């Protein structure tokens, strides 16, 4: 998946998720990193990292994407999109017990695309706050 397609997909997903939901809080960061003398990856590498996290009444979401480029022009994109749905907020019931404040349906889409291979993993389960 190309970077433009990935960015458009994430923007569409974020917009659809928050059309009717004003964020209680949200945070965005953009970080650039350049390094030399790596032993495991290309000797010189530039990495751009985008992160976004937000909480709305019924859910929260965390997203990050690393776009890496080596001096040999090898490119790689890795991202994770992790929305969680609050069962307490959806049901209107207090689901707190002991140190647990809420029970959530937790999901993650992790994906990697580079010059050699790519993968998509979809994870789901129960989460606790």
Listing of model-derived features with the role each one plays in the protein:
Residues 32-38, 67-71, 107-113:
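Transmembrane beta-strands of outer-membrane beta-barrel pores
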Residues 1-24:
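Cleavable N-terminal export/targeting peptides
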Residues 28-32, 52, 63-65, 103-107:
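Membrane-embedded beta-strand positions of outer-membrane beta-barrel proteins
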Residues 20-26, 58-60, 87-104:
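Short loop/turn motifs that connect adjacent beta-strands in outer-membrane beta-barrel proteins
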Residues 44-48, 75-79, 118-124:
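Residues that define the transmembrane beta-barrel architecture of outer-membrane proteins
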